[in-house]
C-alpha cells in the first residue's frame, strides 16, 4: 500500500523533540540510523533519486538490510520547510535498499499533490527517510501531542501523516488533511498516533559513485 504524506516540521527544521523512550520496534532503527548503516541508506536513496532524474545510469549502492521486522518507510523531498514531494510504503518491497529505492523513485513523480520533481531541483532539495512505529489507534485526534508524536489520518479518500513536530496544533493538521481532500467528517476517519525515526541530508550525491555518503545524516529523535 502506498501512502501519500506530509513529512515536514521536525524533520525539515532539525528541531529535536523532547527526549522520550522509543517504541520497542523502533529501537533497532534508531541504532541503524545513527551508525554507518544510516549513511549507506541515505547514499542509496540519493543514488535512486539520481537515476530517477536521469543524472546517473545505474544503481550500485547497497545499504545493510532491515535491522528488525520491516517498518513503514517514507521518503520526502523538501525545500526549506516546504514539502516538495513525499511518498511512503506500509509494506516491505524487498530488501530495505530495494524498498527505499522504489519509494524514492516514485516520490519523484507519483505524489499527486505536487508536480513531478525536475532533475535540476534535486540540487536545492533535502531528502528525508522516516521509519514509523508505536501505532496507537485513537478516537480523539486531539489526544496527540503534535510536538512529540506523529498523527496519521486514514479515510476512504486516502492517508496523510504528520511527523512529530510538523503540526504545531492538531487543528492545523486536520485543516491540512481537509485541504488536500483526505478528510471530511471526523467520524469517518481513523486516527493513529505514531513515533518516527528520521534521517535527513542533501538530496544529491556529493560524489555520484562513492560507496558511502560523505555527509553525516541528521537523525531524529
Annotate each predicted stretch with a short phrase:
Residues 6-14:
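Bacterial N-terminal signal peptides
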Residues 22-221:
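Basic nucleic-acid-binding interfaces
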Residues 16-18:
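N-terminal signal peptide c-region/cleavage motif recognized by signal peptidases
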Residues 1-4:
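Positively charged n-region of N-terminal signal peptides that target proteins for export
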